[in-house]
Amino acid sequence: MWHAISRTSRMSQSGCPSGLLADKNISSSATRVIVKTAGNQKDFMVADDISVRQFKEMLLAHFQCQMDQLVLVFMGCLLKDHDTLSQRGIMDGHTIYLVIKSKQGSRSLAHSFRDLPTNDPCHRDRNTKGNSSRVHQPTGMNQAPVELAHFVGSDAPKVHTQNLEVSHPECKAQMLENPSIQRLLSNMEFMWQFISEHLDTQQLMQQNPEVSRLLLDNSEILLQTLELARNLAMIQEIMQIQQPSQNLEYPLNPQPYLGLETMPGGNNALGQNYADINDQMLNSMQDPFGGNPFTALLAGQVLEQVQSSPPPPPPSQEQQDQLTQHPATRVIYNSSGGFSSNTSANDTLNKVNHTSKANTAMISTKGQSHICATRQPAWIPALPSIELTQQLQEEYKDATVSLSSSRQTLKGDLQLSDEQSSSQITGGMMQLLMNNPYLAAQIMLFTSMPQLSEQWRQQLPTFLQQTQISDLLSA
């Protein structure tokens, strides 16, 4: 059987309630709950395991209203119908705030609180031990803003958002701009007690004791927090700054470092990008041969590069073993004409800290022997002379420059150099031009003019004969 004892809202001259409930005959299984409304408060004796819905049904007989009009608030949180009082931590002597919504549903809770009486000078708060305690408010503070503060701190937007206009940002802005709320937030003593007695705050302080020392014991930090809560424009600005910083890792439309310094971790991300670029530049300068990302730009400077297949088996097994053991070998053919071709069998990546050396070898191709320079890493031993056969020409036929064309060019260049060196007349002519630069310049001028070059060609035998006579006289 539930017992209800009504308590009037009239206060004595001392500012305390006129009558207190003597609960000497209360059994241990029952709980005394104080229900506080806008005009009065009542004490109810309920069971420990009673649900919120059953408690609302009990309140309907006293307040003459419907079930959907009742809203119960405890410790800044709305009580749901399926919850029990013991689950929400409601114990003996705790205070539950009752809000009765209008039947039309047009008036918001903020508007209903504005019409509350303001003649009560003090407010009775909850106490876990069942004793009454008083929190004296400054002059001009009334009971209605205290109840409103409890309700504003609740999770009202999560439940019954279709009927509560408090979930709208406009209503929240009006509540924060209310002078009564501003005066309430400016009261440091009341806010300290309100925050410390909140259930979530108590759990937070139990898990993190440094929060109580940092926030509650430090009046300056608490004052800054309250100033931030009173300034709605500053809260909106912080939300706008935090919103893009959450998606900084995967931005939809990334801007080139736009406002990066104002975002958390912006300077760190900017410095990391600069550090990566500097590391790549330093690595390329200190290690120009291995892992250099800029070496690909020099690929166009190579005249002709031929990538060959594995080498054919030579006649001897010893040479075959040597070829398989030395995959990186470069052969450069040089002739008097200045022609060179570069052939690479397999360039390895581990040639960073190795220098290259040149060895000479004889290569015979159809009776023509030529001297070539073989470039290989220093850690590879020198290769013996390898005879290139006709099979090499078939393997390199798809290359940019074939060995057959290079052999013909080398042969022609060698024959031309032999003819030029064997001719005494040509040798004397070249010596004369070297000794007389002015004469060489005139000859170049004559070659550019057809008429002068024809006359020079006709007089050339006489000129050569005179030069031979002068050489004999000088000898």
From Swiss-Prot:
Domain of life: Eukaryota
Bias kind Polar residues: ranges: 129-138
GO terms, biological process: ubiquitin-dependent protein catabolic process
Boundaries of every Ubiquitin-like domain copy: 31-105
Any Pfam family matching the protein: UBQLN1
Residue segments, region Disordered: 113-138, 305-325
PROSITE patterns to which the protein is assigned, alphabetical: UBIQUITIN_2
One GO cellular component, as annotated: cytosol
PANTHER family in UniProt: UBIQUILIN (PTHR10677), UBIQUILIN-LIKE PROTEIN (PTHR10677:SF9)
Name under which the protein is recorded: Ubiquilin-like protein
